[in-house]
């Protein structure tokens, strides 16, 4: 529950203040979504001589934050990540409380029960 509240507070901040997106290290190299930045003396950096390292700037946390909360009319919802081979194992999310927003542990989609 604390993680959901923290995530909700984070979404309330302006996009520039969230701290998501591509960051740059002190050497000017782009930092990946996992926070990896290579040392200047690392031998694996030879792959990037005369060209820049390509980092996907569409971090998953940014894309999930743009998704609206799905309002459902049931008390228990099943999330399978879209189904098929591209989804994830089916999980059931309990939406009993009136103020509760359920978040899928696999894909991060949020659900809220629409009370009549």
From Swiss-Prot:
**InterPro entries named among the record's database cross-references:** NDUFS6, Znf_CHCC
Q: Which UniProt keywords apply?
A: Acetylation, Electron transport, Membrane, Mitochondrion, Mitochondrion inner membrane, Respiratory chain, Transit peptide, Transport
Query: Which species is this UniProt entry from?
Result: Rattus norvegicus
Q: How does it sit in the membrane?
A: Peripheral membrane protein
Similarity comment: family membership? Belongs to the complex I NDUFS6 subunit family.
A Pfam family it matches: zf-CHCC
Q: How does it assemble?
A: Mammalian complex I is composed of 45 different subunits. This is a component of the iron-sulfur (IP) fragment of the enzyme.
What's this protein's function?
Accessory subunit of the mitochondrial membrane respiratory chain NADH dehydrogenase (Complex I), that is believed not to be involved in catalysis. Complex I functions in the transfer of electrons from NADH to the respiratory chain. The immediate electron acceptor for the enzyme is believed to be ubiquinone.
Protein name listed in UniProt = NADH dehydrogenase [ubiquinone] iron-sulfur protein 6, mitochondrial
């Amino acid at each position: 529950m604390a993680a959901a509240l923290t995530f909700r507070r984070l979404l309330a901040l302006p996009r520039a203040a969230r701290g998501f997106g591509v960051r740059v290290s002190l050497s000017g190299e782009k930092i990946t979504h996992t926070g990896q930045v290579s040392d200047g003396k690392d031998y694996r950096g030879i792959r990037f001589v005369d060209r820049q390292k390509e980092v996907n700037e569409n971090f998953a946390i940014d894309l999930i934050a743009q998704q609206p909360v799905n309002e459902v009319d049931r008390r228990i919802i099943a999330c399978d990540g879209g189904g098929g081979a591209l989804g994830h194992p089916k999980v059931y999310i309990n939406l009993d409380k009136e103020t509760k927003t359920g978040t899928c542990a696999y894909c991060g989609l949020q659900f809220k029960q629409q009370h009549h």
